[in-house]
Amino acid sequence: MRHLLVTNDYPPKFGGIQNYLWELYRRLPADEVVVLTHPSPGWERWDKAQDHSIVRTRQPVLLPEPWLARQVQELVEAESIDLVMYDPAVPVGMLGPRLPAPYGVILHGAEVTVPGRIPGSRSVLGEVLRKSALVVTAGDYSTREAERAAGTKLPVAVIPPGVDCERFTPLPAGERAATRAQYGLSADDLVVLTLSRLVPRKGMDKLIDAAALLQHDY
């Protein structure tokens, strides 16, 4: 199956969603994938280093406007695309119900939670989701929020963010012990690691509060 990803968030533009998408798409068969996105600094060099096809628009941002609809449809026909994947579902995914090709959406968190709680945008998001042939979510939370906004069960595939195992590998026992000692931790001390931006919606404050409640137990 050949499919087209339409997104505003793709490397070399930096960010969590960009990294999530790239880690997915770089692992797919290169001859089955086309990515449509906007230009970002350094894109020429980046695109040359990738195995899969990347098409850059002349416009600086993708919006559900007639020019983008035309370009998506042209790529669908020229590349024999079977499925169009949109990220985010709103606003880019609003093209899905307007075009004849089957489509799906990719959901992470805030881009479904925020419009899903505002009456006007919730109805738009709900329509996009209900008409999707596939909904890819990064976890159970995104799935629940999507189905709440849609008001029904959805054809969901949960694909959590992965880890580049070639870049990030467990330390050997000796280095691990030395690193723990550097931070005043013994070999059997419990360690909870979270990696995130410190913004309210990500709930790091809740983790800190929970850790304080456990200080006498650990």
State what each model feature region is.
Residues 169-185:
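A short helix/loop element that forms part of the nucleotide-sugar donor recognition site in Leloir-type
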